[in-house]
Amino acid sequence: MKLWKLTGASVAAALSFTAVAQAQSFVAAPAAPPAHPAAYMYGKFAEFLGEESGGEMSANVVGPEVVSLPQMKDALQTGLASVGNSLPLYFAADFPETGVAGDLALAGRNPHAMGWAMTEFVVNCAPCQEEYKNFGGVFLGAGSSDVYVLMTTKPVETIDDLQGLRLRSGGAPYSRWAENFGATPVNLPVGQTFEALSQGTIDGTMASIADMLSYRLVDVATNVLRVPLGTYHVTSNFTVGADTWADMSVEQRTQFAKAANRGDPQLTDRWAYQMPEEANAAVAEAGITDMEPSEEFLAASNAFAEQDVQARVEANPLAADFEALIGKWEGIVEEVGTDPEALAARAWDEIWSGVDFNTYGM
């Protein structure tokens, strides 16, 4: 009888150990410091992954000192990271087709619509999927910044004030906008903006108002002009390493995708809504001149943006596909609102419910 009790206890312990052993932990790399919206998103994702998998999967979130953005490709291919935040425009040579959506940056007026349009675009874009396969990753969604504005160290009230200004540009569409109005675009990593403004190397930046806090531009910028300059939406929030994805069961892939789908709008919510609100308060407190553009300035800027977008749409069917998705998701966001969980539920129905996770990303 004692032997039976001992054996039963041993079996129970073995079963318990097996259950623990089967629970999987994935190294998750937002490639961003704690204050960054990507880190916020990954914190939410860790919660969602536990919920969606019933505790069978977990995320071990690591900082940029372990995996940085430029290291993401190698990290995913070597297994240093199981899932990571990769920006296709950092690897432009690897993502020419995916990057087409980025060339329509000036179309961005609704952050959530841009993030979901990007997600649906890549999921259904065969050449984009091939690019991710060659990259060694699986795409599970995108997000978006707020609408970019102009932050400068010189007053800008009229179009003439742009003449000769050196403006940091985060991509080709912003450079085209600057050049059209007589400014000189300067390609510069966002992390170098503060130093460049401080030293007078540049006169301003076309970027998220959140950079006022993220990169302490609030300490050097003197003027903000709220001319809408589009969004940064070519993200791949949860890029799963190909080997990691292949080792998952179909059920695990589905659960992982559900967690990622819930995490995607958290990036947009933090980057495009929460942080701008905090940055706006900091701008006001610092006494920075904060202006809306004149009707003339706004009309000219919007006209150029429309012309720029249409030129890309007419030249590339993929650009036309993306433009159509922007319109679709602008309508959905207007209907659903900006609550991240409500949008994620709708996105699952619109985008992911038709995906075969037996073959997706394989």
Please describe what each predicted stretch is.
Residues 8, 24-113, 139-362:
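N-terminal secretory/targeting leader peptides
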